[in-house]
Design a protein with these regions (language model features):
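Short, low-complexity, disordered segments immediately C-terminal to signal peptides
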Residues: 32-64
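C-terminal motif of bacterial Sec signal peptides marking the signal peptidase cleavage site
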Residues: 27-30
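Active-site-surrounding "flap" and adjacent substrate/cofactor-binding loops of secreted or lumenal enzymes
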Residues: 89-93, 97-160
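Second-shell loop/turn segments in exported
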Residues: 80-84, 115-116, 179-180, 232-241, ...
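Noncatalytic, helix-rich "gating/capping" subdomain that lines the substrate-entry/channel surface
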Residues: 134-427, 431
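Zinc-dependent metallohydrolase catalytic domains
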Residues: 150, 188, 194-198, 426-561, ...
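Sec-exported extracytoplasmic/periplasmic mature domains
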Residues: 95-103, 130, 134-138, 161, ...
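Bacterial N-terminal signal peptides that target proteins for export
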Residues: 7-17
Length: 719
């Protein structure tokens, strides 16, 4: 899983919604992390084992879109229908064969869009930390003001206080909203955008975030990413999503009403905002191309930016952001930024202001009045086919755990991961690295010079297991006000966002901290960071069924071994392979070997293009290429460790299929096919097994005509 560093997503508020919607990057989308990538799904080459898929948000709502109905009855009927069918032969559907019982008996929780072992582990981590949270709240009278425990307890208490949220209205967000609405000129509008980014880290039209420089990973650089496209380019341009976009327009209208607009004006604004996002989407790169550093790494000096953004006073804007004076900046999507510039004219000012008001309130609605929060959560539930609203205390708990992720992560690591576990997993990583090195040296399509460089990259790889050695308090400057002193949820959220953004701005002036983690210890995922040439395995994923110190080698190889090898493979996928052993985007291939690699990658993309993901909708082979290369490479590597032990191979394949057992609502599946860089779980099992030679050794009964059989000359793979 590459944990694609979601700098391409908006920070803070939207990031929390992403986290609660899924903490399992390993499974569906994140395998690489921390390389400059564009927001909202733009990838830099970082890879994660899975896509986000843990906690989901729900809440009360006013006039929400209809959610899925009668989940228990529908799922019960589905379960009975499944049981009435026969378990498929392993020769025809290995994923269903192994997971038949669990998939027949397990129901998607009513307040979630999915169930999986990743989801279950995420819920287990939440429960562990929720107990600590409740104990902290009980101790509140004795806690010292300004301590981490006080901040956590009082944040949670304000998150639960509906009356205070209702009374606060927009709270401290109101001045930012007024700054946007009162802008009488484009320069004044841009000044309001700069204030939102500088103070809170929020962006709408011009999205600037810092991350490592691709060509010098020891330094930070500021990247101009794509603008806020709501549900994203892929959905905005999907001709089958008409009814979905109708609901999205209704959601925009409700947000604009909550901003103070009359219903008729809000409806008109909603129509214009959606049309505007579609116009912007037409100018932006598709997800499949946002993973190519050659495409998204475009350095511009401030003077060159001025030519690109002719309707912006670039020096003044950079100064207002606090990032003036850099040698260069990086534009990830030149045509998208050109399109933004074209819209920055006085005749579009009202549209631009409405667009930013919507973007701001959509980001922040979770922390505002019960009605606004309910509207946001109801829209989220509609998008993902979630039938039930989440209990208020669980919602507040998830919000608190997410906002204080590393603070809770330190406590989780202390309780749930031992030094012995860390040593065991580290030893397994080294064993897999050795096997990977052996496989690279045996490749017949790669020359000696490139092999030597690949081995150097493996030997230089940094291993991070369980939890960071040091925890940095990025919220040290934040004052969390207790309810008794008039503290409100929105006020405390803004305090945290200001502290994080100020910390981020100061961090950008220093060399990159190579000890920093992009995931909290409790996250149920893993990632490869190409800019650090590092593989990272949080304690949250180092639990059963992925890892057990009591399991035999083959079984653990099929679980955590597959995760480890997957992340290592990201160092050599279609994007990660372009980074050297120091994490710099630098060519270390011979021309001939690179041509061979790209030819093999093309075959992988073509193969996955033919894989059905869900009811006539197919996997996008280019969009998922990096993750598919990592899946194929990981299984080839770990099976080489088990060798020709057929019993061991069967145990490995069984555990491999087991860890991917999952169920999704129809809506969630469709969205994932559009917006995820990972293939669906069933494809990740069956398609990979069909292309793995050891699978045929373990199950010699496989024959031509079986659905799990693929002739040797048709099998694809690289590593």
């Amino acid at each position: 899983m590459t944990v694609r560093r979601d700098h391409m997503m908006k920070k803070n508020a939207k990031l929390w919604l992403v986290v609660v919607v899924g903490a399992a990057a390993l499974v569906l989308s994140a395998c690489k992390a921390k390389s400059p990538a564009p927001p909202s799904g733009q990838s830099s080459g970082a890879g994660s084992f899975a896509a986000e898929e843990g906690r989901e948000n729900t809440g009360s709502t006013t006039n929400p879109p209809e959610a899925a109905q009668a989940p228990e009855a529908a799922q019960a009927a589905e379960g009975q229908a499944a049981k009435s069918r026969l378990r498929p032969r392993l020769e025809d559907d290995y994923y269903e064969y192994v997971n038949w019982d669990i998939l027949s008996e397990t129901r998607i929780p009513g307040d979630s869009s999915s169930w999986s072992y990743l989801y279950q582990l995420d819920q287990d981590a939440y429960a562990t930390l929720d107990q600590l949270l409740k104990e902290t709240v009980k101790k509140r009278p004795s806690l010292e003001m300004g301590s981490t425990e006080q901040k956590i307890a009082d944040f949670y208490r304000t998150a639960l206080d509906e009356e205070a949220r209702a009374a606060a209205g927009l709270g401290g967000l109101a001045p930012y909203l007024e700054s946007v609405r009162s802008a009488a000129t484009i320069p004044q509008y841009l000044e309001s955008l700069a204030g939102l980014r500088r103070d809170l880290g929020l962006a709408s039209l011009i999205n600037v975030q810092k991350t490592e420089d691709l060509r010098d990973s020891s330094q930070y650089v500021y990247y101009f990413f794509q603008p806020d496209l709501g549900p994203g380019k892929e959905i905005l341009e999907d001709g089958t999503m008409g009814s979905f976009l109708d609901e999205y327009q209704s959601y925009i209208g409700r947000v604009m009403e909550y901003s103070g607009m009359e219903p008729g004006d809000a409806g008109k604004a909603a129509s214009e905002i959606l049309a505007f996002q579609r116009e912007l989407a037409a100018a932006t790169l598709p997800l499949s191309r946002r993973q190519d550093p050659d495409v998204y790494y475009n350095p511009y000096t401030a003077a060159q930016l001025q030519q690109l953004l002719s309707n912006v006073d670039v020096p003044a804007y950079l100064d207002a952001l606090g990032i003036a004076g850099r040698d260069f900046y990086v534009v990830t999507d030149v045509k998208a930024l050109e399109a933004c510039n074209d819209w920055l004219t006085e005749d579009h000012l009202e549209l631009l202001k409405n667009y930013t008001v919507f973007s701001l309130l959509s980001d922040m609605s979770l922390y505002l009045t019960p009605q606004m929060q309910g509207n946001a959560l109801a829209w989220h539930n509609f998008q993902n086919g979630i039938a039930e609203m989440k209990a208020a205390d669980k919602l507040a708990g998830e919000m608190t755990q997410s906002m204080f992720g590393f603070e809770f992560g330190r406590l989780y690591a202390e309780q749930s991961f031992s030094e012995e576990d860390k040593e065991n997993v580290t030893a397994m990583i080294r064993q897999i690295l050795a096997a990977y090195k052996k496989r690279i040296l045996a490749l017949d399509w790669m020359g000696d010079e490139t092999k030597a460089n690949a081995v150097k990259k493996l030997d230089s790889m940094t291993l991070k297991v369980g939890y960071p050695d040091h925890f940095t308090d990025i919220h040290a400057a934040a004052r969390i006000t207790p309810p008794e002193e008039g503290g409100t949820l929105i006020g405390n959220v803004l305090a945290l966002m200001r502290a994080e953004t100020a910390f981020d701005l100061e961090e950008g002036k220093k060399p990159v901290d190579k000890e920093k983690w992009a995931m909290t210890p409790q996250t149920v995922n893993a990632y490869y960071n190409p800019s650090g040439n590092e593989i990272v395995f949080p304690a949250g994923i180092l639990q059963e069924p992925f890892y057990s110190p009591e399991a035999d080698l083959a079984t653990d190889m099929g679980g955590i071994g597959m995760v480890i090898a997957h992340e290592i493979s990201h160092a050599f996928d279609s994007s990660g392979a372009m980074y050297d052993e120091k994490g710099n985007y630098k060519m270390w291939w011979t021309e001939e070997d690179l041509e061979n690699f790209r030819a093999l990658a093309g075959k992988v993309a073509d193969y996955y293009d033919g894989q059905e993901g869900f009811e006539g909708r197919f996997v996008n082979g280019e969009q998922t290429l990096g993750e598919n290369i990592a899946d194929l490479g990981s299984l080839s590597c770990i099976t080489s460790i088990v060798g020709d032990d057929t019993d061991g191979l069967r145990a490995l394949f069984t555990r491999f299929a087991t860890i991917w057992a999952s169920k999704y609502t129809d809506e969630a599946m469709i969205r994932r096919l559009n917006t995820d860089v990972h293939s669906p779980a069933k494809v990740r099992v069956n398609a990979v097994l069909c292309n793995t030679d050891a699978f045929y050794l373990a199950y010699p009964q496989l024959r031509e005509g079986d659905k799990m059989y693929l002739a040797p000359e048709q099998r694809v793979g690289i590593w």
